[in-house]
Amino acid sequence: YHEFACVQLHNTLMGRGDIIKETTLEIFNTKDKEYWNPIPKVSKNHMEYEVTSSEVDMWQSFDRSIGHHFNLSIDLNSCTGCGACVIACHAENNVPVVGKDEVRKSRDMHWLRIDLYYSSGETFKADDQTKEDIDGLGDSLSTFGKMEQASQNPQVAFQPVMCQHCNHAPCETVCPVAASSHGRQGQNHMAYNRCVGTRYCANNCPYKVRRFNSVSYTHLTLPTRSTV
């Protein structure tokens, strides 16, 4: 028999609609900016104080006065989760494959993934209400277990996720050999020949988009042949 590698349910989340922030343009324009971008607060002497982002930043800001700066925007109103961008990213960047055996172990390596969010109830709001009604640890375990199943007619949301090229990227600060570095154009750079494979960057990435390919298909041991 042949064992197929099915990846349809990879990166699929049920009952997690509370982390999806969706609204209409009318509501977005009528709400105050503090509603969408609340001012950060720190606790001092058990009192909360409003601070600016620069005051709580541990790192010095980069010089953005010169050079080009790149930006990528995704229209989530148009995204249908087809996965064509994942295939295009593979082709454009010549991303190496890991083989069918590794894919069966959920080790498929893409630089771009699409998270799929399905509601356990009819809507994401219904899921939020279900979570609000949870009473106690036992009820929590059973309820969240049931929410792992999607509704027959669920509300669906798609979220393409790739490297965010963070301003002060966590993957850069933990690399012991500076293989991950920050470029002048705002991009997160990676020096492959400097990497020693600690994978600290993957552990420290909040978006879980750092991928490792430990298999080198270009250095396979080939049978030696001698001529007489």
Question: How should these model regions be labeled?
Answer:
Residues 135-142, 146, 155, 170-172:
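Phosphate/diphosphate-binding loops
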Residues 1-71, 77, 88-91:
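Long, contiguous, secondary-structure-rich segments that constitute the structural scaffold
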Residues 82-140, 199-205:
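Carboxylate/His-rich catalytic cores and anion/metal-binding grooves
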Residues 71-92, 125, 157-178, 189-208:
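Cysteine-centered iron-sulfur cluster-binding motifs in ferredoxin-type domains/subunits
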Residues 150-158:
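Gly-rich Lys/Arg/Thr-decorated short loops/hinges at beta-loop-alpha junctions or inter-strand turns
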Residues 218-224:
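Conserved small/polar residues in nucleotide/adenosyl-binding loops
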